[in-house]
Amino acid sequence: MNGYNFTDRVRMVLQMAREEAARLHHEYVGTEHILLGLIREGEGTAAAVLTCLNIDLEEVSGRIEETVKPGKAAAPAGPDLPYTSRAKKVLEFAMSEARQLQHAYVGTEHLLLGLLREEKGIGAQVLMDAGVTLQEARSEVLRLLGTERGETAATATPVLYTPDARGSLQLAFQ
């Protein structure tokens, strides 16, 4: 499949991730910034999953702030911040999770599962240190989607992805 529908919430989370990276004077968007974006957004299925798993979102946010120190130089703002290879992997895994669940959209729940599936990034490490496992999160997503149906495809906006010459994923965020 050459394109996926990212919900408006996911697009907002990714914008917030860029803002968090800039706030911390980082010259990149990493998994920690994506997790901060998910926490800051706070109303999507991912936030509901974490809350149902008794995860204190403020504590997780504080843990990230303790782990990553602010950069020294002013970071470029906006869409110019590059995604780290781990952050790109999270997005790939999020699309894979959506595909496995046979969803035509990528919601915050898929982004959360992508973070956990990536395993090695700061975002995943902080979540795992807080006691979140991929299996528990996936089970909770399935439980919540059974009643709430997740974020609707009606709020999804197409975001195309294509491999570049080196085979890495290039995302076209609008």
Regions found by a protein language model. Give the residues of each.
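Histone-fold recognition with a strong bias for associated Lys/Arg-rich disordered tails
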Residues: M1-Q174
